[in-house]
Amino acid sequence: SDAASLRTKAVRDGEDWVITGTKAWITHGGIADFYTVLARTGVDGPRGITAFLVPGDAAGLSAAVPEKKMGMKGSPTAQLHFDGVRVPDARRIGDEGQGFAIALSALDSGRLGIAACAIGVAQAAMNEAVAYATGRRQFGRPIADFQGLRFMLADMATQIEAGRALYLEAARLRDAGSPFSRQAAMAKLFCTDAAMRVTIDAVQVLGGYGYTLDFPVERLMREAKVLQIVEGTNQIQRMVIARHLAGPETR
């Protein structure tokens, strides 16, 4: 997650910029109308990065074969290759050298979106688990009557409600124009970890059926996993939160 070490370069040529390099793990790679591209225009480190808006059909821009993923099948992810892609200076976003700061500001809002997605996935998994547990009968009664399973459902519901409250509080701070970076990182961390736990437990509630493609909980479990990775891994979220609490690490 060392985003500031990027190697794609943009070189000024009159009123244009010429972009050369490769980008990995690009969402909608190969089908997007536009791409927000961060490229190095100056010194090493964050201050040498500038953002550009590049049309998807720009000359010299090509996409590799999409990655074969365990989830998110509806959104292709692919490498992009920039072979002397020329864009006018009018497509520069912000000032030269502001690209990294722009990207970080977008990450905070993106983390809120991922947190909300995670709670939606978890809610869907719990709904499936409850429906199955109340309909499936063993020993003459619904399996939802068994305390061990009831406690699993209770834990699912508690994690979902806690996560929902956490990301909504961060969203309220954002809407009010207040700092929300720490809360966004907390929401992303908690909600995506909760989604992973809830979906795994939902598969367990359904037993063997949960492991088959005939029921949706296995897909929800696969979809939950990527949410712990995108918009900064959950290990990165812990670093962000800790820096807000204790300051940056000593060097």
Q: What positions do the PLM features span?
A:
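Conserved hydrophobic/aromatic beta-strand scaffold that supports enzyme active sites
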Residues: 5-9, 16, 34-38, 51-53, ...
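Long, acidic (Asp/Glu-rich), low-complexity accessory segments flanking structured domains
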Residues: 83-102
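Short Gly/Pro-enriched turn/cap motifs at secondary-structure boundaries
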Residues: 1, 25-28, 41-43, 69-76
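Short, surface-exposed loop/turn microsegments at beta-strand edges and helix-strand junctions
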Residues: 58-60, 71-72, 96-97, 217-220
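Alpha-helical interface subdomain recognition
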Residues: 3-5, 12-17, 79-81, 98, ...
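Short, ligand-facing micro-motifs at secondary-structure edges
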Residues: 3, 62-64, 91-93, 213
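Flexible, small-/acidic-enriched active-site or ligand-binding loops
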Residues: 57-88
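A short core secondary-structure module
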Residues: 20-64
